[in-house]
């Protein structure tokens, strides 16, 4: 999580809407995902008391580890060391069997969409490449498409959604 600026940046705007305009924000989110009026329950962040901004974004799929076997499956699919996914907001929309997971990644401009994979060949890169290969095959994407550069963060979110769909979450 970057330090939050005074009135600028994607995270600042997301927090403003979630904190000061929650009803309208929830309405727009529920409308955007095709569930108008459905209730949304946003998860709280953890605390990081030793940081300049004392909140810690939810990381990876830690908020789902209460599901039997999910942590082991996730660790087999994706590296869980440094550089793991950080979510700007996580919530559940709907009730009961119709409940669906919401994962938010706020972006204030197109430049924020650009990123490269920082994983090393001796670290998590082989697992990431294997996950991308599986997802590309499933989606019918070109095998040679480069998902490790330029829009890596978007690609790793697509891989995460593929994993969650496969696990019926």
Residues of each region from the PLM?
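Acidic, metal/cofactor-coordinating or nucleic-acid-engaging core segments within structured domains
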Residues: 117-169
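Short beta-strand-loop-alpha-helix junction that forms the active-site gateway
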Residues: 106-121
């Amino acid at each position: 999580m970057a330090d939050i600026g005074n009135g600028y940046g994607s995270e600042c705007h997301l927090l403003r809407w979630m904190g000061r305009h929650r009803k309208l924000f929830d309405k727009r989110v529920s409308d955007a995902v095709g569930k108008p009026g459905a209730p949304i329950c946003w998860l709280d962040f953890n605390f990081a008391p030793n940081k300049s901004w004392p909140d810690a974004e939810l990381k990876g799929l830690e908020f789902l580890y209460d599901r039997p076997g999910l942590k082991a499956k996730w660790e087999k699919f994706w590296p869980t060391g440094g550089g793991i996914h950080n979510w700007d907001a996580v919530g559940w929309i709907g009730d009961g069997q119709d409940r669906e997971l919401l994962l938010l990644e706020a972006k204030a401009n197109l430049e924020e969409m650009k990123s490269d994979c920082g994983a090393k060949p001796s670290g998590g890169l082989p697992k990431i490449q294997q996950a991308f290969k599986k997802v590309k095959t499933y989606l019918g994407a070109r095998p040679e498409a480069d998902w490790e550069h330029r829009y890596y963060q978007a690609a790793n979110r697509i891989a995460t959604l593929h994993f969650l769909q496969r696990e019926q979450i």
